C-alpha cells in the first residue's frame, strides 16, 4: 500500500531489527505490529521513547489486539496512533501523509 502510494518503505522482521535499522536511518514514521518475534511492539515503542535521538519519532501501531487495555498500554508507552485490524487504508494513508509532511518541514527524509 505505502509503496504503491510512492513512499519508501524499510522493513524489519522484528523489534530488534527495527531498532538496528533506526540507528542507520531515520524514517518519518514507524509502523509496528504488537506481535513480533524477539521483541514485541510494546518493547519497540519503549526503546524508541527511551532513546534521546528517537524519542520524538511518530509511532503508528497496527494490530489485531483491539481490547482497550492494549490500546491504553500503547498510549502509555507513547504510541501516537493505534489502528485495529482491519483498518481503513485511507486512515493509515492520512496518518502517514501527515507525519511525512511534518518530517519534510523539519528536513527528515520520508
What do these predicted regions represent?
Residues 87-96:
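C-terminal output helix
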Residues 1-10, 99:
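Two-component/phosphorelay signaling modules centered on CheY-like receiver
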Residues 25-31:
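Active-site beta3 strand of CheY-like receiver
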Residues 36:
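Receiver (REC) domain active-site loop signature in two-component systems and cognate sites
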Residues 65-66:
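Short, conserved "switch-loop" micro-motifs in signal-transduction and mechanochemical regulators
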Amino acid at each position: 500500500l505505502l509503496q504503491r502510494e510512492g513512499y519508501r518503505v524499510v522493513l524489519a522482521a522484528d523489534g530488534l531489527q527495527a531498532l538496528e535499522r533506526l540507528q542507520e536511518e531515520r524514517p518519518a514514521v514507524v509502523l509496528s505490529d504488537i506481535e513480533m518475534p524477539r521483541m514485541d511492539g510494546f518493547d519497540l515503542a519503549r526503546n524508541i521513547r527511551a532513546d534521546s535521538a528517537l524519542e520524538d519519532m511518530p509511532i503508528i501501531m497496527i494490530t489485531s489486539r483491539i481490547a482497550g487495555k492494549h490500546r491504553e498500554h500503547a498510549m502509555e508507552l507513547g504510541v501516537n496512533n493505534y489502528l485495529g485490524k482491519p483498518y481503513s487504508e485511507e486512515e493509515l494513508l492520512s496518518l502517514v501523509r501527515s507525519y511525512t509532511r511534518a518530517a519534510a518541514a523539519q528536513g527528515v527524509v520520508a
